Amino acid sequence: MTSSVSRPSGRRADELRKVALTRHYTKHAEGSVLVEFGDTKVLCTASVAERVPEFLRERGQGWLTAEYGMLPRATHTRSDREAARGKQTGRTQEIQRLIGRALRAVFDLEALGPRTIHIDCDVIQADGGTRTASITGAFVAAHDAVSTLIAAGKLARSPITDHVAAISVGVYEGAPVLDLDYAEDSRCDTDMNVVMTGAGGFVEVQGTAEGVPFSRAEMNALLDLAQGGIAELVQLQKDVLGASHA
């Protein structure tokens, strides 16, 4: 069923877009990555602060939190900056919480110590899958921030317990497909975002039927596609981290 679908990009049903992770993209942050999924481009930075939120004071553990935003012309038409409106949208809040949860799932916060890693994901160009690209790139940025702490003698070992990556899947023209771009996302019957660890554990599954309910068989097929795609993304993370892999 998945092999016969005709996708706007010409990709196979189980084929990722071209994915690139460019490390050390900016010079000031402890970790920075430009992540590209086809025409979707997100700048992910990881910054370290030697303090924790008030609710973690005297607990002897660290924290990791995330913020997400889109540049005004990241999409086809310009959007006002949320700062100019004075309020974040519900979508923005949902996505940045998802990014934070995803990364905390693979961090030993006690081993991080009483400090905070701030993840910032800024969408430069959007063509579908910005939240999943953000998670995949943010992990590499966080890894580099941890490496900076180890090199400075502030950490004896890495608090990272596993890799984490994310991908979108959906039912497009009746067939399950991997890594939806905007042309597919805007027309799909089902849209699902899946976050998994390198060991194959599920961190989060967000699935919505866009008018046409999906079956259990379709859900299983989508999860299988996502698992295969995330395995590819984790391998790419390992490849780009190379010798510095924790």
From Swiss-Prot:
UniProt-recorded Gene Ontology molecular function terms: 3'-5'-RNA exonuclease activity; tRNA binding; tRNA nucleotidyltransferase activity
Annotated residues for binding of phosphate: 91, 129-131
Reactions the enzyme catalyzes: tRNA(n+1) + phosphate = tRNA(n) + a ribonucleoside 5'-diphosphate
Pfam families: RNase_PH, RNase_PH_C
Cleaved signal peptide residues: none
Swiss-Prot/TrEMBL GO biological process terms: rRNA catabolic process; rRNA processing; tRNA processing
The protein's Enzyme Commission number: 2.7.7.56
Keywords: Nucleotidyltransferase, RNA-binding, rRNA processing, Transferase, tRNA processing, tRNA-binding
Top-level division of the source organism's lineage: Bacteria
Lyase as UniProt keyword: no
Classification via PROSITE patterns: RIBONUCLEASE_PH (PS01277)
HAMAP family according to UniProt: RNase_PH (MF_00564)
Family: Belongs to the RNase PH family.
Entry-linked PANTHER family: EXOSOME COMPLEX COMPONENT (PTHR11953), EXOSOME COMPLEX COMPONENT RRP41 (PTHR11953:SF0)
Subunit structure, interactors included: Homohexameric ring arranged as a trimer of dimers.
Function: Phosphorolytic 3'-5' exoribonuclease that plays an important role in tRNA 3'-end maturation. Removes nucleotide residues following the 3'-CCA terminus of tRNAs; can also add nucleotides to the ends of RNA molecules by using nucleoside diphosphates as substrates, but this may not be physiologically important. Probably plays a role in initiation of 16S rRNA degradation (leading to ribosome degradation) during starvation.
Listed name of the protein: Ribonuclease PH
Taxonomic classification: Bacteria, Pseudomonadati, Pseudomonadota, Betaproteobacteria, Burkholderiales
